[in-house]
């Protein structure tokens, strides 16, 4: 018997109140998800018991038949979900339920869109699925006992979803968790065997352990159906990945994805394969239709679910796929790994290395199929894939040398070919449009598309009709540092080193350039003397047709864009100075040859303008403004 003294009243954290209100008021049109989420949690609890039971069979407590039971009571207006999984201790209840979503709660709210379907998807993704119960219930009572604890260590948690909850210690003979939902007014349609079965078959048919309800039988006396004492399994209760592919519908594949990925939307694509030979395993891998909130958090644990002979071993087995494929969801079920496999064993396992290589091959093949398909539906899917995951795939150029060529073939960029913001140009597209004499793939990196498109470095390339790739993602500097060539064509930054257009430049142009370099030698020396340590050197350029000057990094130096990225990330930037290149045909440069009084000011203005044009920051903005104002004033006065 429990007394009031046993009951502890606690408050949710502040953000929990917002979350509960969201569940109740914002997701009502998707209210069926409450049962999906609670069944999914029950399934996870059974998986955890199976895993811990490998090393401690006593946890089963003479009850090895794992299942989930769904019941309803029309008179009490309740729905009950019972599992005999691992259960929770008092502290686990506080940690997992009293402290909503822990570190993910703020990100959850930041990610809300106002679209009910999309926001419903976020519930499972952020680990707050339990609270979907409050969509249909005005009171939730959870009673649980962790496997291995004695019956007097049961815990009862109860809340009306109004910002506080109660905890009490109770006796619970059976391990596992029982959740009773006291339905809100107007939710009586859920108190129907047909309705609950329909929801289970729609959302949870893939769950691998039985979901049971009491069987309905016809009662001749009352001329209606009544519940019998006989159990009936509602779902197929078998591992979907172990079934033949021709027996699985697309809807079943999609529902299983939603379960393993905690997603509300169907996936973009999937691959299901059984591998036999030296290694025997099954892989069911999915590419999501949208990026998760933590995609770029490489420290956050990502990975696949690992099973051994249908027994769940672990979530987030990151060793099964490389980091650049961390967006992939799904399962690997091995026939060869030991049941007591640990994360430490995974690090050293050659079997895992083989599974990893096979999984990478399948995922890249799936992406290639979308990229090369003639079907408009697949082409749209690839565009979605690239928009959501393209930046992450680029990491593979540095991480996965053995698949570098395959990954490079999948890369997409913006280019000067059509200047569209959407990244649609492949390296193969670029090569197919190269001029006959062209030997290199030209690119420029910048911190945004507008900055790249307006870069003065493009001027000679636009004049000669040479296409240039515009690389504007933060990862692109890392990409080109690790991708030196593609199918025999070297990649060349147009903002680094001496400009060498090779056969694209005729002999007469080269002779003219050599002559001009001599004619302007005195000017470049004088400018170098004025600018001092700001530049490595000043030299004539032929890459400009409209601008008076630009900055160029030395061949092996850090580019200005990369330097700014490193600085913004708090990393040390290697000490290097740019070249200032001047356009001998520009009126300002030709006038500067004969300027004496304002030569230093003009030289500094040219350098500062070039620095601003490439997205850099001035060391002395006030000095730049003063020199520019003096120049403008001089022009105005001379005009009078």
From Swiss-Prot:
Pfam families for this protein: HATPase_c_3, HSP90
UniProt cross-references to InterPro entries, sorted A to Z: HATPase_C_sf, Heat_shock_protein_90_CS, HSP90_C, Hsp90_fam, Hsp90_N, Ribosomal_Su5_D2-typ_SF
UniProt keyword terms in alphabetical order: ATP-binding, Chaperone, Cytoplasm, Nucleotide-binding, Stress response
Compartmental location: Cytoplasm
Subcellular location, principal: cytoplasm
PROSITE patterns from the UniProt entry: HSP90
UniProt-annotated stretches for the region B: 344-564
Region (C): 565-640
The family this protein is said to belong to: Belongs to the heat shock protein 90 family.
Record function comment: Molecular chaperone. Has ATPase activity.
Name of the molecule in the record: Chaperone protein HtpG
